[in-house]
Every structure is written in structure tokens, then in C-alpha cells.
Regions:
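A structure-centric signal for secondary-structure junctions around beta-strands
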Residues: 52, 71, 115-116
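A short, N-terminal "cap"/entry segment at the start of jelly-roll beta-barrel domains
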Residues: 1-57, 62-66
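Ligand-binding loop in jelly-roll beta-barrel domains
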Residues: 103-129
Length: 131
């Protein structure tokens, strides 16, 4: 049996990203980037979702206007480089880096390159998991 790699339930718009079906188990960065090319800010796409977990791709342009999220999250930098600001601390980041942000913490990417793309993984309950 062949599993569809990308079968969103509805077309993505800047206000409403793709929401994948619950049985989707594989995603493609190339397919996500094709969706993002047609979006303006914010540029992100939900690739996989199961329970509280979601896998997304995020490619900000010029500025990152994020606000704190209700869930814990991981960023896995796919391409590019920049500065990651997290709870008042700033650190360089680049392709291959993994960054952890607890739920509710102020964070954003700054001074990033034009080719900056990151995977985003959200999981856990509202308010995050216990430390």
C-alpha cells in the first residue's frame, strides 16, 4: 500500500497553513518550500501533526515577529544563519543547530540570512512540560 506524502485537507493561505491529515506520516521540505514561496509573512507550513505534536517549517523574511508560544518547541536550522534571541540572551545560530525554547519564553531570530529556513517541532501541553 502506498501512503500519500502530502495530502493537505485544505489549501494553505498566509492566515491558514496546511493542516495535514492525522494519518500523514511523511513530509517533504521541498513540498513545504513550494507552499512557502507563495506566502508572505509569516511564512510557515504545518507538515505533520499527531496529538499535541506538530512539525512545521518556518522561513521568515526580513524580520521575525514571533511571540511566545503555548507549547515547548525545538528549532532545527535547515539552512542559513543568524542570531537567536531567547529570554534576553543572544547567540549565533546556523544550519545544523538545534534550539530549545520552553513554552511562554520570549524568542526570535534576528539578523538572519535570506536563505534562512528552520524546522519547528511543537509538543506537549499548554504551558509546556515540567522541567
Amino acid at each position: 500500500m502506498t501512503q500519500s506524502r502530502s495530502t493537505p485537507t485544505k489549501p494553505a493561505t498566509p492566515e491558514t497553513p496546511n493542516i495535514p491529515s492525522a494519518d500523514k506520516w511523511q513530509a517533504s521540505l521541498f513540498e513545504a518550500m513550494a507552499v512557502l514561496r507563495n506566502q508572505t509573512s509569516p511564512r510557515f507550513d504545518v507538515l505533520l501533526k499527531r496529538g499535541t505534536m506538530s512539525v512545521e517549517v518556518y522561513a521568515p523574511q526580513k524580520q521575525d515577529h514571533q511571540t511566545p508560544h503555548r507549547q515547548d518547541e525545538l528549532y532545527i536550522i535547515q539552512s542559513g544563519a543568524g542570531i537567536f534571541s531567547r529570554d534576553g540572551q543572544r547567540s549565533p545560530c546556523r544550519a545544523g543547530d538545534v534550539l530549545l525554547v520552553p513554552a511562554g519564553m520570549d524568542h526570535r531570530f534576528e539578523d538572519f540570512t535570506d536563505d534562512f529556513v528552520t524546522w519547528v517541532i511543537f509538543w506537549g501541553p499548554d504551558g509546556g512540560e515540567a522541567a
